[in-house]
Amino acid sequence: MTPQEKLRRFEEQISPHLKSAYNLAKWVTRSREDAEDVVQDAFLRAFSAFESYRGDDAHPQNAKAWLLTIVRNTSMTWLKRNRNSGATLGFEEALDDPRDRSPDPEEILLISCDREEVRQALEQLPLDFREAIVLREMEGLSYREISAAVGVPLGTVMSRLSRGRDWLRRILSTPKRLNPKEGAGLR
């Protein structure tokens, strides 16, 4: 394959998944800037390894899973190097970047409802569970694609999703105590 053909195929098959790659990196690193660095590094790695990619135009999800595997591995390497940085990312920041598209009014309302509560619940999940939920619920990967991307058996993916969802359900259904400052208007 010529360099021009490699670049063309890469742009057609891999580049459309840039937003998904960025979203996954954002959830893992908890920082927009670090996610950008991770994605840049992952795309360089993907381009270097692209000749070994065996996907085709008929199976674009395979390209997404292949790329997200690289992004995940790059993110994990970043995480090992920067574990003590303490970076945090707000839930609203972890959603699709508003520069990518304009949400409709219904979507704005849904996103704003209980945003902080959901963010806090997701933050409490162990990385393995959070990663599985992000790949499934936000990026739309199948169980098999998650299995390939994360490098664990299909049963482990199913278990992580089930346990992660149960954990989220428990966190979100626990009654919250009012902070005295928050309850000031309820006399």
PLM region spans:
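Acidic, proline/glycine-rich intrinsically disordered inter-domain spacer in sigma factors
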Residues: 95-123
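Arg/Lys-rich amphipathic alpha helix in sigma70-family domain 2
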Residues: 51-54, 68-90, 103, 111
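A short, charge-rich alpha-helical start-of-domain segment used by transcription regulators
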Residues: 1-23, 33-39, 47, 51
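C-terminal edge and immediately downstream basic/flexible tail or linker adjoining helix-turn-helix-like DNA-binding
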Residues: 1-4, 8-10, 86-93, 144, ...
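Sigma70-family region 2
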Residues: 3-4, 43-61, 81-83
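Helix-turn-helix DNA-binding motif, specifically the short coil turn and the N-cap/start of the second
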Residues: 31, 142, 151-156
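A short pre-motif secondary-structure segment
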Residues: 132-136
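Structural recognition of an alpha-helix C-terminal capping motif at a helix-to-coil junction
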Residues: 37-44, 48, 61-73
